[in-house]
């Protein structure tokens, strides 16, 4: 039925498969930036939290009887830590983007979305394509022009990522300035890859840019990257959260977030809050090694290296696997150019990162198709 499509994917080196990798490989492919996924004491803490309750399953939607004290505690902790009026748990970052875009785009609203926004957001715009306008990646001038051309009486949402998941670029402060000077405009910030990697206390894009006023900001924070768990949370003014609670299909018509994941997120969050300065210092040491060895600045939790074609990219990935390192090989159509995506993780030692950097340096000397992205 799909044989020709699959053959075509094989032909252009875009075929993908699930794979169980050798556990002895050093992991530089995942989004476990702070290395929390291997801390068994935190897993035990999460289990102990859950054991104290009679029920260990969410059972139903949050709007039936699936809302649990652990859910409420996590929402309160995040709202307090990130200084938002209210918070709402969702099942994943994908479901969070779906909730925001499907629900907030009421009849008189427009969405202006960065062209490099996460695939879950771009997919969600297909529900209401006539209300969506894309602007060039991190291009303030292009956004301003499109806002100028839009009807003045419309409610406007601007969707960006704090740190873009495929190129590691950080969204500029200018986006905040735009919503401050534009009537009826709100900023949606997907902080999946910025929370835990940037900011004075690793709290993400808003802290990085020292943004305090959040009455026109909607933040989507996921738990599956730096917090090494699963799920996500929307943080926003109370009225926005109430509206999402009452209208978002991916909140109303789905089972509440797993209680084990919620407990694990709480355990990891508590550790993060207590150790954030030490975690930041350790992450900066790994970043410094990459800069000193490869000349690549890494202000976030990962960096990318561009390749001319898919075979060259896969050859580089194989070369590194033979050296004992697992890195991400990101191919079109996910990205326009093949990218080696190298994630830093505190579960790896500084010596591991030094060895990886040297392996990349060795590869670059023998492969002309390699260049830093």
Swiss-Prot record:
Signal peptide: none annotated. It comes from the Bacteria. One of its GO terms (molecular function) is 8-amino-7-oxononanoate synthase activity. Its EC number is 2.3.1.47. The modification N6-(pyridoxal phosphate)lysine is found at residue 225. Disulfide bonds: none annotated. Pyridoxal 5'-phosphate binds at residues 93-94, 165, 190-193, 222-225. Keywords: Acyltransferase, Biotin biosynthesis, Pyridoxal phosphate, Transferase. One of its GO terms (biological process) is biotin biosynthetic process. Catalyzes the decarboxylative condensation of pimeloyl-[acyl-carrier protein] and L-alanine to produce 8-amino-7-oxononanoate (AON), [acyl-carrier protein], and carbon dioxide. This is 8-amino-7-oxononanoate synthase. It comes from Helicobacter pylori (strain J99 / ATCC 700824) (Campylobacter pylori J99).
């Amino acid at each position: 039925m799909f044989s020709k499509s699959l053959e075509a994917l094989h032909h252009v080196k875009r075929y993908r498969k699930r794979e169980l990798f050798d556990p002895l490989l050093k992991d530089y492919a995942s989004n476990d930036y702070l290395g929390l996924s291997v801390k068994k004491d935190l897993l035990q803490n999460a289990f102990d939290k859950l054991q104290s309750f009679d029920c260990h399953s969410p059972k139903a939607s949050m709007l039936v009887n699936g809302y649990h004290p652990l859910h409420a505690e996590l929402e309160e902790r995040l709202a307090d830590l990130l200084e938002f009026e209210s918070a709402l748990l969702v099942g994943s970052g994908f479901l969070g983007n779906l909730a925001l875009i499907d629900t907030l785009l009421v009849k008189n609203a427009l969405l202006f979305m960065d062209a490099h926004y996460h695939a879950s957001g771009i997919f969600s715009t297909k529900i209401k394509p006539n209300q969506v306008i894309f602007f060039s990646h991190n291009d303030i001038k292009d956004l301003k022009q499109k806002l100028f051309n839009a009807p003045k009486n419309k409610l406007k949402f601007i969707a960006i990522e704090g740190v873009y998941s495929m190129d590691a670029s950080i969204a500029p402060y200018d986006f905040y300035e735009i919503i401050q000077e534009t009537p009826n405009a709100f900023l949606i910030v997907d902080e999946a890859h910025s929370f835990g990697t940037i900011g004075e206390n690793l709290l993400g894009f808003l802290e990085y840019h020292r943004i305090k006023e959040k009455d026109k900001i909607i933040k989507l924070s996921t738990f599956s990257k730096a917090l090494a768990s699963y799920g996500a949370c929307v943080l926003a003014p109370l009225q926005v959260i109430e509206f999402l609670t009452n209208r978002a299909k991916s909140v109303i018509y789905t089972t509440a977030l797993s209680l084990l994941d919620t407990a694990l997120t709480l355990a990891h969050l508590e550790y993060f809050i207590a150790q954030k300065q030490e975690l930041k210092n350790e992450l900066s040491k790994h970043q410094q090694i990459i800069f000193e060895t490869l000349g690549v600045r890494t202000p976030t939790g990962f960096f990318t290296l561009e390749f001319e074609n898919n075979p060259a990219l896969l050859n580089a990935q194989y070369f590194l696997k033979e050296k004992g390192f697992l890195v991400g090989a990101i191919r079109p159509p996910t990205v326009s150019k093949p990218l080696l995506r190298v994630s830093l993780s505190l579960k790896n030692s500084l010596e591991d990162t030094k060895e990886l950097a040297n392996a990349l340096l060795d590869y670059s000397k023998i492969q002309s198709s390699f260049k830093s992205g």
